Amino acid sequence: MANSKMAFLAFLAVSFLCGLVSATYKVGVGRADITGPPVEINFMGYANIKQVGRGIHTRVFARAFVVEDEKGNRVAFVSADAGMMGYGLKREVIKRLQARYGNIYHNDNVAISGTHTHGAPGGFLMHLLYDISILGFVPQTFEVMAQGLYLCIKRATDNLVDGRILLSKTTVLNVNINRSPSSYLRNPAEERAQYEHDTDKTLTQLRFVDLENNLLGAFNWYAVHATSMNNTNRLVTSDNVGYAALLLEKEYNPNKMPGKGKFVGAFCSSNLGDVSPNIMGPKCSISGNECDLLTSRCPTGEGDCFASGPGKDMFESTQILGQRLADAALGLLNEQSQESTAREVTGDVRFIHQFVDMPNYNGSTYNPLSRKVDKIRGCQPAMGYSFAAGTTDGPGAFSFEQGTTTDNPMWNFVRDFIAAPTQEDIKCHEPKPILLATGRATFPYEWQPKIVSDQLLKIGDVIIAAVPCEFTTMAGRRLRNQIRAAASAVGGIDTEVIIAGLTNIYTSYTVTPEEYQAQRYEAASTIFGPHTHSIYMDVFERLTKAMMRNETVDAGPSPPYMNDVMLSLNTGVLFDGHPINTDFGYVKSQPNKEYGINETVKVTYISGNPRNNLFTEKTYFTIERKINEDRWKVAYTDASWETKMVWHRTNTILGFSEMDIYWDISPQTLPGEYRIRHSGEYKYILGGKYPYEGLTHSFTVKED
């Protein structure tokens, strides 16, 4: 009998250990097009009212993975090529998912993160401060994003198979720099000594495979702003991380057009708050001298202060950095590579979520430096003076400087005309001088969120912390350490913590309390005051412990429903017209008869307004290669890196417009006979929309 008991216990022990070594999940990945109106709508990111879309360089996509454990616990994570995420948008996605799947998906187990591209159409956030430079809410942007976000999760769900998840990491050194190094230096020296760099250089990858080890997808997190494309860009772009995703997907979806194919590869945002891709550093535009370290200003006559990337222009910089990120991810996926350090993810799936009313949050936190318990509280949302100064990725307007800790009577007068802060607000935010008292502004509706979304997704021994803002480098490091320690203390397991930035709702930035004192751009944009980061540390520690204990928490107060109060100054398309003796689709400028490698093809069509039809999951044009006498094959689309689509009005009163299509012929281009086809819709002056098509004559691409 004793031997039987020992054998049974041994069997249980072996079974437990085997469970740690290998775990079977249901895994699925999906992708969908979320490209909004590419023309006449401002882009979201730089808050530059002049940055109005004029066409497409690359389409933007949403990419999802779904994981379910053996008990049926399920989570969904989405990385969207968008500036950030809004709660109204997430709520609409959940509504559509529940109409299809019932309560399988809900607010607690779905996380939607933005890559932070600054080159996609805005107007979807439903808070005035974030939509004001877009001239308000844009229903067309909102709808295409809501449907695409829903579709990518649906496709991941429909693709669920038994599979495994592997985690791996690598160091990528030549992609990011800290754009506020003087703020970073405010953090304690003993803390900084624990890290080699002032930005996170680790790329973390989750690889999804089926039980035959066939690769399904790979999601990569790396801390870098998607701002290789600067605020002069007018073409829809997924920027550096989006290009990296296109390269990764091209590798594992051979002979497929961008955005097509079963393999899904994503590069997701992390604690990128103070992290720039413009690795050549900030310089004065005229003199070439370095900018002032504290204020990021240049002396009179030396030009503006801005940073640049490693390429000769923003397109090449985007390409270079995207390639470096893709190469790092490919190295991890190549099992024969020295970079491959993959280990299997094991354990159950859990999730937890809570809405937190930040201005009314009161708590306490232990300060390891002073070894005392500090009281913490939130403030009404407010933006500081340095917010208006912009960053070295995109300088602001007027004479504002980063690092400003004093106010100005003139700007205070302007501020108070909009909404005046109370004396309590002013004291609460010190040393930030308040430029916009957004928490007190209510006309025509809420300017910034007061209620935030805090969420954790646990997939085995990996925890994804979904944060509603842009954490700086050290702010993210502290949060990761806090969550890891809490999970270890309660669950007794060592976890890998991933920060997913700009998730579920957007509330600008979060810096450490020390960085807050410097009041550079990121600190001025930390909207809930100097204790913002401490509150998040408190909340996420509590949520981690509750999740590890399988406890439920109070849902918290829901953000307000604002769909019915949205305003917009954007007009729709009135009508389209064309010059006499032409028609829509007429090729005004034909290609040359012959081109060589590294040359650019340009053609021009008489066109309708692209806002008439977004051609979602389709394309405004195709570049086709002749296969034989009866067959042409699509070689490139408007989602391809090698192409650009530029639209412009030629007569506003008569509704005339033209479409320029550019194709850069790369060394990888096959020689042969090509032609370009443009598809569109025009809006008739008496009503209705009608399709049209135009086709160039054929031309030859010579062998190199």
Curated annotation (Swiss-Prot):
Keyword field: Glycoprotein, Hydrolase, Lipid metabolism, Secreted, Signal, Sphingolipid metabolism
Record localization: Secreted
Active site, UniProt feature: S276
Keyword Hydrolase among record annotations: yes
Glycan attachment points: N230, N362, N550, N598
GO cellular component, one term: presynapse
Impact reported for V264M: In slab1; induces embryonic lethality
Residues making up the signal peptide according to the UniProt record: 1-23
Further information: Overexpression rescues retinal degeneration in arrestin and phospholipase C mutants, probably by facilitating membrane turnover and endocytosis of rhodopsin in photoreceptors.
GO annotation, biological process: ceramide catabolic process; chemical synaptic transmission; hatching behavior; long-chain fatty acid biosynthetic process; photoreceptor cell maintenance; sphingolipid metabolic process; sphingosine biosynthetic process; synaptic vesicle exocytosis
GO MF annotations, alphabetized: N-acylsphingosine amidohydrolase activity
Its job: Hydrolyzes the sphingolipid ceramide into sphingosine and free fatty acid at an optimal pH of 6.5-7.5. Acts as a key regulator of sphingolipid signaling metabolites by generating sphingosine at the cell surface. Regulates synaptic vesicle exocytosis and trafficking by controlling presynaptic terminal sphingolipid composition.
EC number(s) reported in the record: 3.5.1.23
Domain of life the protein comes from: Eukaryota
Organism (species): Drosophila melanogaster (Fruit fly)
Modification after translation (UniProt): N-glycosylated.
Similarity comment text for this entry: Belongs to the neutral ceramidase family.
Tissues with expression: Widely expressed in different tissues but enriched in neurons at all stages of development.
Catalytic activities: an N-acylsphing-4-enine + H2O = sphing-4-enine + a fatty acid
Pfam families named among the record's database cross-references: Ceramidase_alk, Ceramidse_alk_C
Main location class: secreted
Protein name: Neutral ceramidase
